[in-house]
Amino acid sequence: MNYLPAPDRYAGKMPYNRCGKSGLLLPAISLGLWHNFGDTARFDTCQEMIRCAFDHGITHFDLANNYGPAPGAAEETFGRILQKNPQIRREELVISSKAGHEMWPGPYGNGGSRKMLITSLEQSLRRMQLDYVDIFYSHRYDPDTPLEETLQALVDIVRSGKALYAGISKYPAAEAGFAYNYLRERDVPCLVYQGRYSLFNREPEAEIIRQANQHGAGFIAFSPLAQGLLTNRYLNGIPEDSRIARPEGFLKAEQLSPEVLSKIKSLHEIATDRGQTLAEMALAWLLHNPLVTSVVIGASSADQLLNNLKAVHYPLFTDEELIAINRICL
């Protein structure tokens, strides 16, 4: 049966926010392909998630050269999905990729050198079967490469037409400030900063989010559920099929300390009183911040994606709820 995009996908299902001072609107929720789109994932499941996301107003798909497993596999999967679903029209999508983490062996497969960034983008475009990406990020600050070299590579990539906008991710505040000024002076203003931000990671509030706003850049939050801790999944221990239970996973059992578990249970009580799951409330709390342009979520199924999308129509937080949440998390 041929797939047809939902005709009402832009009829109020998803709010869109302006990204910094640019003309680009991004959905409040973006779909990240960090997990669950590698070569161990079922193609039909991946395709169903992309279709479901598009049908519900998600137009921004967040990738990187090393997303997998294996590195590059998520981009290949995404490219195959776009080829098999021409009804998901390229002009309706914002596709981002990144480079900076280890990608291939040898001295040129990691870091922020001009060679690494430009070569990586060429490979990403081939894997996704695209002529350009909308946003290309320097995925991390590389202290072993002159920052001017990394940033000039972004400038030249945008000027070449192989990316429409430049972004930075996980940069320290000092280096981010330098990047904003360098890029603006060369008429390629930084569109967006992407950083780890959640109820359990409030560090960006100290400077990063405000700094991005002051320089006219948007802010995109990733890992909004703290790698799954901010869900109902661990209320009664560690399930056998959870991320913590996997030895190769990023989340480790020691991160679920008695103190963290107590916080999870207290937040769960507030969410229940609001008529939400903990995950929905954690996402809604991020969307409550007017300086957050978009929140990147992951999903392992279309059903999980739909459950998390409920967060975009959240009930407003009361002052009492916000105080209680801060008391638990800070």
Where are these regions (language model features)?
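N-terminal binding-site loop/beta-alpha segment at the start of enzyme catalytic domains
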Residues: 1-93
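Beta/alpha (TIM)-barrel catalytic core signal, keyed to glycine-rich beta->alpha loops juxtaposed to Asp/Glu
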Residues: 2-13, 145-330
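N-terminal small/glycine-rich loop or linker at the start of catalytic domains
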Residues: 20-38, 96-109, 132, 137
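Hydrophobic faces of well-ordered beta-strands that scaffold small-molecule active sites
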Residues: 27-31, 61-63, 93-97, 136-138, ...
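Acidic-and-aromatic substrate-binding clefts and catalytic sites of carbohydrate-active enzymes
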Residues: 37-42, 66-73, 142-146, 173-174, ...
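Short, acidic/polar
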Residues: 41-53, 112-128, 176-180
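Alpha-helix N-cap and loop-to-helix initiation/capping positions
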Residues: 41-45, 73, 77, 108-116, ...
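Active-site groove signature of glycoside hydrolases
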Residues: 125-145
